Swiss-Prot record:
ATP binds at residues 217-219, 226, 482, 534-537. GO terms for biological process: aspartyl-tRNA aminoacylation. This is Aspartate--tRNA ligase. Homodimer. Its EC number is 6.1.1.12. It comes from Salmonella typhimurium (strain LT2 / SGSC1412 / ATCC 700720). Keywords: Aminoacyl-tRNA synthetase, ATP-binding, Cytoplasm, Ligase, Nucleotide-binding, Protein biosynthesis.
Length: 590
């Protein structure tokens, strides 16, 4: 039906007769002439109808936005004064000789001239996706997946599919369950990741695996999370963690070079402990120049319990955050930031305004100045590198509260005061995560997942001192987003059972949930390691949007609902009966 795409016409097509198919993006009726901007997935071109083609002109008068049409005409160069430098096709136009209205459009529920609500955009997603910026994002996503496949193929990885209907295993979030009709009362689980299957593939001898795969997690959603999402899933045998990172870093550098024309360079490597200490986060945004600086040793003897208490507590921390130019902040702004850090458990926000650095104690303004000596102030200013006009904020509490509160404040100030370089790319690897973390109930939970191997520990050593164990794990972070994470896996049955035991999974439960894995570990399991990237998040970064729903064709809301299809929906009674399921209705309040 078409010979060319609208958005691909250029000066090289001048004089050619073309047939285009697409939609009316805009129409301008000048009486004797009618102009339309005609759109398809590749872009927009100007088409005009003149009196010499009376039939086409007459039919064009009926056109309205979003009519689906076919146009045949001749490509012409525009006069110099009419060239539109803002359009890729702005040097040419198409003189229409014939027009076919394939389908008319009713009055549109979305307004192209205004910002539509996200609710309306999701309800009429098929119209929203016609917008050039949305089409471009999905085209970029398609390019990314194509580049990934070619790269992985070139590096000897095999694309192998794993099951969608599998067994529920504890991986941190709730599973989506699928009832079995054949096995009444039993359920499959949709995979949160192909984790165990890709490990089993390593045990099967397929030493380089990858898959672009859907995953499902029934968890409380955030703005950058979806109940179903896509992973670039990777696993290798006989490769060390640095070797895995080297190949995966090369993949991401390849993507940025091909999609953005940007060379990311070599990625720095930082330990989890250093990231938390310097940035208050395990996914630091290195575009932001501010860092947390420990000052507890300077404040142990001050007569101010808010500082002295944590400074003398082995589990406490006192840290300072220097804000360049922050002395300009008003009292109201400071109070607002004080309320902000309370969200993260902080009790308040002490500060020092540096007016004249050279004057020491006399050159600052601070509500806690009366508790500080001139020597202490000088030491704080020296350690933080403070200059005239800076602000120093303090966090004093346990380690977690200080890191969380000042880490979040650092990001907010970076944005509010334009200190974060939005034009920069700042990738890094974060390694050496804790193996376990406190579950809040006196036990331990895996920081990544139960199949991650510890660094340099035997099973007996791990069993004796699990709290201090370091995981052989690694996350890739770009501009403050965790885009991928992985680890070296446990390939020894004794170690795997030890980890299960530390997590409170008894032997009977181990057999019930992971018997197939424990059996497989008995038969010559190779050392293996892997990683998974979030394709949605990678695409979000590469397309410059901050909303993950912008890079998914048909996303869910933060309530895990599809406004277009109205999923989830009630199942009919016959289907439930066949599955042996009875829905229990909540009692209504009287």
């Amino acid at each position: 039906m078409r010979t060319e795409y609208c958005g691909q016409l250029r000066l090289s097509h001048v004089g050619q007769q073309v047939t285009l198919c697409g939609w009316v993006n805009r129409r301008r009726d000048l009486g004797s002439l009618i102009f339309i901007d005609m759109r398809d997935r590749e872009g927009i071109v100007q088409v005009f109808f003149d009196p010499d083609r009376a039939d086409a002109l007459k039919l064009a008068s009926e056109l309205r936005n979003e009519f689906c049409i076919q146009v045949t005409g001749t490509v012409r160069a525009r006069d110099a004064k009419n060239v539109n430098a803002d359009m890729a096709t702005g040097e040419i136009e198409v003189l229409a000789s014939s027009l076919t209205i394939i389908n008319r459009a009713d009055s549109l529920p979305l307004d192209a001239n205004h910002v539509n609500t996200e609710e309306a955009r999701l309800k009429y997603r098929y119209l929203d996706l016609r917008r050039p910026e949305m089409a471009q994002r999905l085209k970029t996503r398609a390019k990314i997946t194509s580049l990934v496949r070619r790269f992985m193929d070139d590096h000897g990885f095999l694309d192998i599919e794993t099951p969608m209907l599998t067994k529920a295993t504890p991986e941190g979030a709730r599973d989506y369950l699928v009832p079995s009709r054949v096995h009444k009362g039993k359920f499959y689980a949709l995979p949160q990741s192909p984790q165990l299957f890709k490990q089993l593939l390593m045990m099967s001898g397929f030493d380089r695996y990858y898959q672009i795969v859907k995953c499902f997690r029934d968890e409380d959603l955030r703005a950058d999370r979806q109940p179903e999402f896509t992973q670039i899933d990777v696993e290798t045998s006989f490769m060390t963690a640095p070797q895995v990172r080297e190949v995966m870093e090369a993949l991401v550098r390849h993507l940025w070079l091909e999609v953005k024309g940007v060379d990311l360079g070599d990625f720095p490597v930082m330990t989890f402990a250093e990231a938390e200490r310097r940035y208050g986060s395990d996914k630091p945004d290195l575009r932001n120049p501010m860092e947390l600086v420990d000052v507890a040793d300077l404040l142990k003897s001050v007569e101010f319990a808010v500082f002295a208490g944590p400074a003398n507590d082995p589990k406490g921390r006192v840290a300072a955050l220097r804000v360049p130019g922050g002395a300009q902040l008003s009292r109201k702004q400071i109070d607002d930031y004080g309320n902000f850090v309370k969200i993260y458990g902080a009790k308040g926000l002490a500060y020092i305004k540096v007016n004249e650095r050279a004057k020491g104690l006399d050159g600052i303004n601070s509500p806690v100045a009366k508790f500080l000596t001139a020597d202490i102030v000088e030491a704080i200013l020296e350690r933080t590198g403070a200059q005239d006009g800076d602000m120093i904020f303090f966090g004093a509490d346990n380690n977690k509260v200080v890191a969380d509160a000042l880490g979040a404040l650092r990001l907010k100030l970076g944005k509010d005061l334009s200190l974060t370089d939005e034009d920069k790319w700042a990738p890094l690897w974060v390694i050496d995560f804790p193996m376990f973390e406190d579950d809040g109930e006196g036990g331990l939970t895996a920081m990544h997942h139960p199949f991650t191997a510890p660094r340099d520990m035997t099973a007996s050593e791990l069993k004796t001192a699990p709290e201090g164990a370091v995981a052989n794990a690694y996350d890739m972070v770009i501009n403050g987003y965790e885009v991928g994470g992985g680890s070296v896996r446990i390939h020894n049955g004794e170690m795997q059972q030890t980890v299960f035991g530390i997590l409170g999974i008894n032997e009977q439960e181990q057999r019930e949930k992971f018997g197939f894995l424990l059996d497989a570990l008995k038969y010559g399991t190779p050392p293996h390691a892997g990683l998974a990237f979030g394709l949605d998040r990678l695409t979000m970064l590469l397309t410059g949007t901050d909303n993950i729903r912008d890079v998914i064709a048909f996303p869910k809301t933060t309530a895990a609902a599809c406004l277009m299809t109205e999923a989830p929906s009630f199942a009919n009674l016959a289907a439930l009966t066949e599955l042996g399921i009875q829905v229990v209705k909540k009692a209504e309040n009287n």
